[in-house]
Amino acid sequence: MDEESLAAALQTYRAQLEQVDLTLRAVTDPTQLEDLTQLHTDLQQLIELTESSLLSIQKCNLLTSLEGNPSLPFHEDPISLPALEVPTSLSSQDKEYEAFRMAISEESQPLGSNDETSTCSKGSEEEEEEEEEEEDNTSGMKVKAPYYSTWGTLEYHNAMVVGSEQMEDGEAGVRVLYLYPTHKAMKPCPFFLDGKCLFNDNCRFSHGQVVSVTELQPFKEADLGSLAVDSPCLAQHNDGIWYPARITDIESGFYTVKFDSLLLKESVLEADSIIPPLRGSDSSSSSSSDEEEDGAAEDSVYAKVLGQEIAGTTCSSEFGGWEAHTRGIGSKLLVRMGYEFGKGLGRNAEGRVEPIQAVVLPKGKSLDQCMEIQQRKKAGGKHKHKTSKRRPKASGQGGGAKARDIFDFLNEKLEGKFTSACTAETQKTGEKKGKELYNASKDSKRALSVQVAITAEKIKQKQREICHLKESLARNAGRESVISNQLEVRLSGARKELAGLQQEERSLQREQKKADTHKKMTEF
């Protein structure tokens, strides 16, 4: 609406308000009185709104007239302007309008006297307007900005530009807020954009990060089509941070995800709360040069994710075989951290998978002395091997020098076969018995220890039972003989069982000691 129509409407509303006031004075019915009061209030509000609209239009007309006629003397009577007619009855809005017009005329008077200053101010205003336009153009733009974490890694995240700033070295930069924060330090502060944050630089949330314009990359939309069941992703938690997770189920646009962290529960999310992981595989990159450069940049930032086709370091022995003698906590921790059995550690799975043999070195010796001892042992082993070959010759020569008679000849002929057979049989049985003892001590050492512990526990229980029976006999002394006889019978039986258990314990201990002694004598 224009100024004239608003002025006419304002007069009409005022006339209606006067009629309502007259009616309110004459009406006595409470129902009509309530309706008229509500109408009176509505008309007052409508008049206030119309006056404010009329005042704003008058201000705009005044400013446009000043811009269109800069040579107009501002000290003249403003009422002489044809487009600005002021009503005869001045209200509060009219007074405000008059004050505004006078202030504009006072501020604009120096401009007519000095043209050079006006041109300079116009030039500066134009530059400021251009800068504001550029800032408006960049503000709200979505880009891919770098993020330097506290532990020194460089990651590229999707972000939004909130303003242009200058870097410390004078280079052009922008302030960005990250759209998918993966850490608390990246999460935008909810009070920063409103200017109500009281912590400033000490805020634990992000007030935006200033990055160089040259480091920005084109924005990439999240491709939800690549997400499937059992594929990794980034999912938004209740705290607004995006955590790594894995999709377990997809049903009618809802994704059931299980977070990698054990502290976070499984949740069902919509498509806007889930994105593919930032560390995409190399196969997803297209053949265009720009995307290849982006892929190369991402590969330089992140470690490669090894696929199934990359062959790891082969292991000649069974991996983790040594854990048969332990609880296997090492492999469990490695599996929790994503390790795959049979592959080495490292970027290309080139790590060692063969276990390192433990070498026990003598105490109190330096490494040089240990190396000398090992070399002596090697040299001594060779020397012993040579001397052992020479020993039979010396024994043969010594045996040949002994004098022999007819009886030795006969004994050798008649008893030689029998004695040789007996000695061979005894040697075999001895070896067999020794092996059985060794194997038994090796395989059943734990079983023997368990059996000894069980027997000792039974002995303690039987001893407690005997103590209770003795106390019962002491209490029943001098009473009925039947109860005393039964207690004595039970006590004697318990003592026999205790003796048998003690004998069994001693035999088990002897077997255990025998196995330990045999092991000490056979293993060097």
Curated annotation (Swiss-Prot):
Cellular compartments per GO CC: nucleus
Region (Disordered): 105-142, 279-298, 375-402, 500-524
SUPFAM superfamilies linked to this entry: CCCH zinc finger (SSF90229), Tudor/PWWP/MBT (SSF63748)
An example molecular function term from Gene Ontology annotations: RNA polymerase II cis-regulatory region sequence-specific DNA binding
Keyword Magnesium listed: no
Zinc finger intervals, C3H1-type: 184-210
Function: Transcription repressor that specifically binds the 5'-GGAG[GA]A[GA]A-3' consensus sequence. Represses transcription by recruiting the chromatin multiprotein complex NuRD to target promoters. Negatively regulates expression of EGFR, a gene involved in cell proliferation, survival and migration.
Name listed for the protein in its UniProt record: Zinc finger CCCH-type with G patch domain-containing protein
Lineage of source species: Eukaryota, Metazoa, Chordata, Craniata, Vertebrata
